[in-house]
Amino acid sequence: MQQIDEHSNKNRLKVVLAEQNKSGKWLALQLGKTENTISRWVRNINQPTVEQLFDIAKILNVDVKTLLNSNCD
């Protein structure tokens, strides 16, 4: 089984949503995506496209850099 640590996360979507008291369900509705898609992004199983990251940043009123983990290799 592969062990995943916090530094392997490519995005900070889970953190930013929590900071804003927003849910994955709410974001899914805003983006017209399924809750499953958002869940996979939040858990860093899949990643949103660059265009989707910019859409998310706009919806959450944050700089797109806020959504990215600067510790990625």
Regions found by a protein language model. Give the residues of each.
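A short, Lys/Arg-rich alpha-helix, primarily the initiator
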Residues: M1-K22
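Residues within the alpha-helical elements of helix-turn-helix
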Residues: E19, Q30, I59
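Helix-turn-helix DNA-binding elements, focusing on the entry/boundary residues of the two helices
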Residues: G24, E35, V50-L53
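Residues in the helix-turn-helix
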Residues: W26, T37, T66
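Short alpha-helical "recognition helix" segments of helix-turn-helix
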Residues: L27-A28, I56
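Recognition helix of helix-turn-helix/homeodomain-like DNA-binding domains
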Residues: K33-P48
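DNA major-groove recognition helix of helix-turn-helix/homeodomain DNA-binding modules
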Residues: E51-T66
